[in-house]
């Protein structure tokens, strides 16, 4: 099955409410959509959201990487030699992880369609349902508690709470108010998005431990490049610490695992450059006895479906952060994963299971 066409288009989908973290506020989910057509007539789909403050990718840079570098190298290639294709994607240019991830998605989609199996089964097939958390954006303690209570009513038993934007006293007040409103049975995991200094993180986490707030884990408490600070927080607290922005590549995962700087790793396809890099990170983590979560950027159901296929395939991936499509006003794609409250069911169709998209106003073909 040979690649005969690679196309991109742009989409923009409004969120139902602003998504706020310590790093940014998002009002609209923007993405570059990739479509690879094969000589069999099959179409593979991929998605790359621009996340400048995390991956450094913009809409223009994603399209440029795809059309000026990846597309010329891939046209005419056969999926029978997919290992060489994946190597080319990762080594033809540095960085540009979201562009690489989107092209890889469309290739894995085509590969699994060629084999006649859902992608998650091709990759390991460990499970066919997932339980996702729901993210509570940074706002006042009262508004965050109200949001948390609303998500609980929708069936979510695990909430991911954004912190790190203000002082630690305000963050602790947020968690106290949320815990009071949702009760003790709901899992609360925190994400500081690099918003604390190491000493602040240790102080905040210890205070929450002493208050009995029952925090499941704290994600990326300190700056992504401060592995010594991350390790300090990990060693000084009882609450499990998860590395997120500190781990893009397998090499960075190796450094975190070797130094035991974190207890857990959050893998995202947009950081890892696609499924091939994500598999390497998870394999190393599993060899070291470290469990992984798979999360995402603000993506449509297309990108989340690809991430869910990867996550569903692996035993060592034990936590899932796939709420982004639920934040959007419009479901752009047909097919893919389905939601029932917090439960995600994997599609049974070959490949990703995406069967088409409704073109949005202003979508631009390249």
Swiss-Prot record:
Gene3D superfamilies on file: Enolase-like C-terminal domain, Enolase-like, N-terminal domain
Sequence positions that bind Mg(2+): 191, 219, 244
Pathway(s) served: Cell wall degradation; peptidoglycan degradation
Coiled coil start-end: none
EC top class, as a word: isomerase
Enzyme Commission number, as recorded: 5.1.1.20
GO biological process, one term: cell wall organization
Matching SMART domains: MR_MLE
InterPro entries: Dipeptide_epimerase, Enolase-like_C_sf, Enolase-like_N, Enolase_C-like, Mandelate_racemase_C, Mandelate_racemase_N_dom
Cofactor field: Mg(2+)
UniProt keyword annotation of Membrane present: no
Induction: Repressed by AbrB, a transcription factor that negatively controls biofilm formation.
CC cofactor note: Binds 1 Mg(2+) ion per subunit.
Keywords attached to this entry: Cell wall biogenesis/degradation, Isomerase, Magnesium, Metal-binding
Pfam short name (any one): MR_MLE_N
Record keyword DNA damage present: no
Catalytic residues as annotated in Swiss-Prot or TrEMBL: 162 (proton acceptor), 268 (proton acceptor)
Positions bound to substrate: 24, 135, 160, 296, 298, 321, 323
Family recorded in the similarity comment: Belongs to the mandelate racemase/muconate lactonizing enzyme family.
PANTHER family noted in UniProt: O-SUCCINYLBENZOATE SYNTHASE (PTHR48073:SF2), O-SUCCINYLBENZOATE SYNTHASE-RELATED (PTHR48073)
Its job: Catalyzes the epimerization of L-Ala-D-Glu to L-Ala-L-Glu and has probably a role in the metabolism of the murein peptide, of which L-Ala-D-Glu is a component. Is also able to catalyze the reverse reaction and the epimerization of the other Ala-X dipeptides L-Ala-L-Asp, L-Ala-L-Leu, L-Ala-L-Met, and L-Ala-L-Ser. Is not able to epimerize other L-Ala-X dipeptides. Is also active with L-Ser-L-Glu and, oddly, L-Pro-L-Glu, but not with L-Glu-L-Glu, L-Lys-L-Glu, L-Lys-L-Ala, or D-Ala-D-Ala.
Listed name of the protein: L-Ala-D/L-Glu epimerase
Species this chain originates from: Bacillus subtilis (strain 168)
Lineage, opening ranks: Bacteria, Bacillati, Bacillota, Bacilli, Bacillales
GN (gene name): ykfB
